[in-house]
Amino acid sequence: MTKLSKRVKVIQSKIDRNKFYSLDDALNLVKECATAKFDESIDVAVQLGIDAKKSDQVVRGAVVLPAGTGKYVRVAVFAQGEKAEQAKAAGAEIVGMEDLADQIKSGKIDFDVLIASPDTMKIVGTLGQVLGPRGLMPNPKVGTVTPDVATAVKNAKAGQVQFRVDKAGIVHASIGRRSFEPTALKSNLLALLEALNKAKPPASKGVYLKKVAVSSTMGAGVRVDQASLQAAA
């Protein structure tokens, strides 16, 4: 039998896995249990009332978290001419065309988000095998293929997170760090839930936001009472 560490035992003693906590209590408890020696990520898992196997019920999008993510984001942009200058002015670390494509093909991917102007997609389209598995392929559904590259860069820098439902119908996302105040985590979570509601597929029937749980990188999940979410929205 695996011996549990002292830290894990403490976490398990504090969290009742069968209980639904109010949003405020859940966030405070997750922060309290995030005792690793680094600034743990605070994450959320949302079970959606959809059939993820059906193409008309895929939920995907992006949202700028009002309190940011607590992470420094390096942005690369495919653009030329005036749009390239706009991307640089907005704070993009890397801006290019064929030179950027060659860099990516060689395996040098020194960025967290990739944005593309629509007129560059002929080049970007050849990079799918490299970018796709890494979740970096630009897509208009999440605002990373856009003529307004400057705004896209600013959004990425400001704390935009992308979300996509997995095969089990669950959306996973980070809403901040342990060092964030509970009010900041709360505003980020509510912004994410609002974005998920806006992305609800017309084909989805019944309860849409079925279950919500928050956790830290090294901690256990804490289930959130739905009534407290509705009251906070």
UniProtKB/Swiss-Prot annotation:
Matching InterPro entries: Ribosom_uL1_bac-type, Ribosomal_uL1, Ribosomal_uL1-like, Ribosomal_uL1/biogenesis, Ribosomal_uL1_3-a/b-sand, Ribosomal_uL1_CS
Protein family according to the UniProt entry: Belongs to the universal ribosomal protein uL1 family.
Gene Ontology biological-process annotations: regulation of translation; translation
Subunit comment: Part of the 50S ribosomal subunit.
GO CC terms, sorted: cytosolic large ribosomal subunit
Keyword hit for Phosphoprotein: no
UniProt keyword list: Repressor, Ribonucleoprotein, Ribosomal protein, RNA-binding, rRNA-binding, Translation regulation, tRNA-binding
Function: Binds directly to 23S rRNA. The L1 stalk is quite mobile in the ribosome, and is involved in E site tRNA release. Protein L1 is also a translational repressor protein, it controls the translation of the L11 operon by binding to its mRNA.
Organism phylogeny: Bacteria, Pseudomonadati, Pseudomonadota, Betaproteobacteria, Burkholderiales
GO molecular function, one term: tRNA binding
Transmembrane residue ranges: none
Protein name from the UniProt record: Large ribosomal subunit protein uL1
